[in-house]
Amino acid sequence: MNILFIDYGNTVSKNYMYQYYGDLYRELKKDNTVFLYQGPLRNTENISNSKIDCVIFGLGYFTQTDPEKYKEIKGLKDLKVPVACMLHKHLSLLQQKLEFCKINNIDILLDSHITYKEHGEYIGCESVRFWFTANPDIYRPRDVKKIYDIGFNGASHGSGKIKGPTRDLRDRVHKKLIDGKRNIFWNSSKEGSLQYRISSAEEYATKINQSKIWVSTTGPILDVGPRYFEVMLSKTLLLCNNMPYEYEGIFQDGVNCVTFENDLSDLDEKLDYYLNNEEEMNKIIENAYQMAINKYTWKNMADKLLEKIEEVACPSK
């Protein structure tokens, strides 16, 4: 398939600090001809000099903070091929981004949030829950010793930024864990600071491998980030807060992860149980790994997207 992939800010580079921004692009390149265009776009006339089968706007495109970048693109409709958008950064210019998708008559909305259905209805297009997954070449089982009971790496999202039952959740979990009962790896900093960042994906992935349990919680708008799948693919036990509506049945307590209540009322009990029941822990870890490796890698996401594009292009099939 010939794909025009439109992005911004060189976020598809392997050297970009968030590698998952470019994982779909790199996966699509393996079996398709992908033409990459980076930057704001006003018309398509000068960027497509060969037959294009579809257009994909990547995550980086929706990191732009100028509302003027979310206008109608001249010539896009005239290409008469399926157009897909990976909606991103919902806290910034969300309405402008939705209007961009609407006025450009996109065919497929890819949204990692539970809002994918309502956003698709507003735009008037197909919508797909498109999880931010992980690359099993990086996040994989390693033959390293488990030296931590529990690990975490990421921004704290404190200072009341998140409202409701998950308010200051990561800070609250940390305070609960620093009583000295367990050996923990906790690398975090306040919102807006990148001091917590581990220098390389390899080092970060190894820290997950070195931990028996890894904490991953929903983000500022109850979003599910790639850490969930990074942990599963690493064969470490995923510990996450209980959000059944947002999880849509994908993350199930005692099956492929362990969930705790947002008020932390059962956190100690669950940690004690699984840290002292290795057999039960390993069953969950194996279930999680098999689910992630078979359904939720970036290859799976790329295949899912290409199938949806073919459905849109040839609806009679």
What is the meaning of each model-derived region?
Residues 253-255:
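Glycine-centered loop/turn motifs
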Residues 310-317:
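Generic C-terminal helix-cap and adjacent flexible tail
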Residues 231, 257, 288:
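Hydrophobic, well-ordered secondary-structure elements that form the walls
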Residues 226, 262, 296:
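Residue-level signal for the nucleotide or nucleotide-sugar donor/cofactor binding architecture
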Residues 278-309:
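A charged, aromatic-enriched C-terminal amphipathic alpha-helix characteristic of glycosyltransferases
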Residues 257-263, 274-278:
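Conserved acidic donor-binding segment of nucleotide-sugar-dependent glycosyltransferases
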Residues 1-74, 78, 82-229, 233-250, ...:
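Nucleotide-sugar donor-binding catalytic core of glycosyltransferases
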